[in-house]
C-alpha cells in the first residue's frame, strides 16, 4: 500500500511489515500501527524512522543502543512478554527514541543541532510477531569503564 507521510513523503508500505503497538505509545494511544524505515543505501543504518500509519504527521527518529555505544538489558514482566508474544530474548529489538532538546540559549540551527537519546523510555519490538511496547520510567545505571 502507499502511504503519504508528512516527513518521509509518499512511501510504499508492505502490510506484512507493519509493527503493532496494541496500546499505542504513551500520549499517542490512538496510534497503534507503525512502519519502520531506514536508509537502504547504508549497509548498517545509523538511524531509523518509525512512521505512524494512523497519523501521517507522527514520525519518530530511532537508533539501536549499540550504535550509540550503549548496552541495554531490560527486564520485562510476564505480561509484557505475553503482549509482545516474545519467543525469547533474541526475538526482542530495543530502539531508542532520538530528539532535539528545546534549548533556547543554543545558537545552533534547529535542524542541524545535536540529537539526544531517550534512555529511560526505550521501545521493545518483537521481531517475529511485529508487536511493540514502550517500556517507560526505567532507572538507568551507567557503568563506566576506564582504560
UniProtKB/Swiss-Prot annotation:
* Entry superkingdom: Bacteria
Q: What is this protein called?
A: Flagellar assembly factor FliW
Q: What organism is this sequence from?
A: Chromobacterium violaceum (strain ATCC 12472 / DSM 30191 / JCM 1249 / CCUG 213 / NBRC 12614 / NCIMB 9131 / NCTC 9757 / MK)
Which UniProt keywords are given for this protein, alphabetically ordered? Answer: Bacterial flagellum biogenesis, Chaperone, Cytoplasm, Translation regulation
Compartments, as annotated in UniProt: Cytoplasm
- GO CC terms on record? cytoplasm
Describe the subunit structure: Interacts with translational regulator CsrA and flagellin(s).
PANTHER family (UniProt xref): FLAGELLAR ASSEMBLY FACTOR FLIW
Amino acid at each position: 500500500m502507499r502511504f503519504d507521510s508528512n516527513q518521509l513523503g509518499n512511501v510504499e508500505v508492505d502490510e506484512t511489515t507493519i509493527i503493532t503497538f496494541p496500546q499505542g505509545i504513551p500520549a499517542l494511544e490512538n496510534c497503534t500501527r507503525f512502519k519502520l524505515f531506514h536508509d537502504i543505501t547504508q549497509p548498517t543504518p545509523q538511524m531509523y524512522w518509525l512512521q505512524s500509519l494512523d497519523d501521517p504527521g507522527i514520525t519518530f527518529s530511532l537508533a539501536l543502543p549499540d550504535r550509540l555505544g550503549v548496552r541495554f538489558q531490560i527486564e520485562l514482566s510476564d505480561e509484557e512478554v505475553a503482549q509482545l508474544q516474545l519467543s525469547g530474548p533474541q526475538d526482542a529489538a530495543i530502539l531508542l527514541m532520538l530528539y532535539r532538546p528545546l534549548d533556547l540559549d543554543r545558537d545552533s540551527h534547529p535542524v542541524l543541532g545535536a540529537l539526544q537519546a531517550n534512555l529511560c523510555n526505550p521501545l521493545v519490538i518483537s521481531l517475529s510477531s511485529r508487536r511493540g511496547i514502550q517500556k517507560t520510567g526505567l532507572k538507568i545505571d551507567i557503568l563506566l569503564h576506564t582504560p
